[in-house]
């Protein structure tokens, strides 16, 4: 299959082409499309017009993502959105190519402004082309699209907010109560790739992305600002919420390189170190413990607190004893055969580094974040 993508270097185009390349190269096998049969033609505003002629002669499917969003003069809307679509369709007709054609429109096509009028004209042109040639056409009226690689301080509020907050730049919100309808770029790309196989989602004359998120402008800003504070608190978002998960990924894509990493507080003593990595309100705390050769750590028990230990490097011994009894349960552990050892409430426990030369590195999960006011930790040797 030969696929033509116009506007290939735009926001949606770049993401679509990237995933089509993954399919072609055998890296994305979840779409049911034979990648070795794909040829991808990329066309953009600075491409040679002769290339468009060649591509339109050979294409088996066309994604027309080219368009103008923010010209210097309003008259350019019609030229960029209607004019190019007309050129594209005329070129297909010249070669008698009636392959399916998808066009990227906007929910603003219903509005009476220069942008909406140009999009609506492009839609009607495509519908007329279908009636004239019998070609299958797919008109997608996208709401606001967000995700990685979207240009900030241009037409996308989400991209601007993510970029500016990530860079500690000011933002302006005129009305935080404005309701936004958004689709995520990965959902858009998945829908467009489904359309290749005739599995598009239709709603009357139009096609649509089935997953739409609705949230106020103020809610978006509040979430992004919370993301900015998370490295300092070691927290992570509520990823059970689909929109939050997608917005967090989008926010991270705008981080300046100097914020790709951030320091952790290592609690160091002569026995080794203990370092918290992630703290959550409902999934506990994740930490790394390092014990020096021959060192024993722990020797305490908890009423409610429970933990999971995984030795990832070194050779150690984990021991547990139920309070009020003398029987000791022992687990010899090492990084070459990882396993989870549960620290059970009501059992005093320790972890011993059996090596004389190597550190013992243990990944630890605890069901609650440490609270110095209620540590629930009581010393007692195993």
Where does each model-flagged region fall?
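NAD(P)H-binding glycine-rich loop region in Rossmannoid oxidoreductase-like domains
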Residues: 45-83, 87, 91-95, 108-111
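Substrate-positioning beta->alpha
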Residues: 152-160, 177-197, 218-222
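Double-stranded beta-helix
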Residues: 325-327, 352-382
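A short glycine-rich, His/Asp/Glu-containing loop-to-beta-strand
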Residues: 260-299, 305
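Conserved Rossmann-fold NAD(P)-dependent oxidoreductase catalytic core, especially the SDR/UDP-sugar
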Residues: 86-123, 130-133, 138-140
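Conserved beta-loop-beta element that borders a ligand/cofactor-binding pocket
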Residues: 124-149, 162-163, 169-178
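N-terminal Rossmann NAD(P)H-binding glycine-rich loop of SDR-like oxidoreductase domains
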Residues: 1-26
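Mid/C-terminal beta-alpha module of Rossmann-like enzyme folds, strongest
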Residues: 194, 198-265
């Amino acid at each position: 299959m030969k696929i033509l993508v116009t506007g290939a270097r735009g926001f949606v185009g770049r993401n679509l082409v990237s995933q089509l390349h993954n399919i072609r190269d055998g890296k994305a096998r979840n779409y049911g499309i034979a990648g070795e049969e794909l040829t991808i033609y990329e066309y953009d505003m600075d491409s040679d017009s002769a290339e468009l002629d060649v591509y339109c002669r050979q294409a088996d499917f066309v994604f027309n993502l080219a368009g103008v969003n923010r010209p210097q003069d309003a008259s350019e809307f019609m030229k960029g959105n209607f004019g190019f679509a007309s050129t594209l369709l005329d070129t297909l007709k010249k070669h008698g190519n009636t392959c399916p054609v998808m066009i990227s429109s906007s929910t603003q096509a219903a509005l009476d402004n220069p942008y909406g009028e140009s999009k609506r004209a492009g839609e009607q042109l495509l519908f007329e082309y279908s009636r004239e040639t019998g070609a299958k056409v797919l008109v997608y009226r996208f709401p606001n699209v967000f995700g990685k690689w979207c240009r900030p301080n241009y037409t996308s509020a989400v991209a601007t907010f993510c970029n500016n907050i990530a860079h500690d730049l000011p933002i302006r919100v005129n009305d935080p109560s404005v309701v936004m309808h958004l689709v995520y770029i990965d959902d858009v790309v998945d829908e467009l790739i489904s359309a290749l196989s005739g599995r598009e989602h239709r709603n009357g004359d139009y096609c649509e992305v089935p997953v739409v998120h609705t949230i106020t402008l103020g809610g978006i800003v509040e979430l992004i600002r919370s993301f900015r504070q998370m490295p300092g608190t070691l927290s992570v978002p509520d990823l059970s919420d689909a929109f939050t998960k997608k917005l967090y990924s989008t926010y991270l894509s705008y981080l300046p390189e100097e914020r790709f990493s951030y320091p952790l507080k290592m609690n160091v003593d002569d026995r080794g170190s203990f370092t918290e990595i992630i703290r959550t309100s409902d999934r506990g705390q994740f930490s790394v413990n390092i014990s020096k050769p021959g060192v024993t750590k722990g020797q305490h028990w908890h009423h409610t607190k429970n933990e999971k230990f995984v030795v990832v490097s070194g050779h150690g011994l984990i021991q547990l004893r139920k309070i009020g009894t003398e029987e000791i349960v022992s687990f010899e552990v090492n990084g070459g055969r990882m396993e989870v050892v549960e620290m059970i409430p009501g059992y005093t426990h320790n972890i011993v580094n059996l090596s004389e030369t190597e550190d013992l590195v243990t990944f630890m999960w605890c069901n609650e974040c440490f609270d110095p006011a209620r540590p629930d930790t009581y010393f007692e040797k195993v």
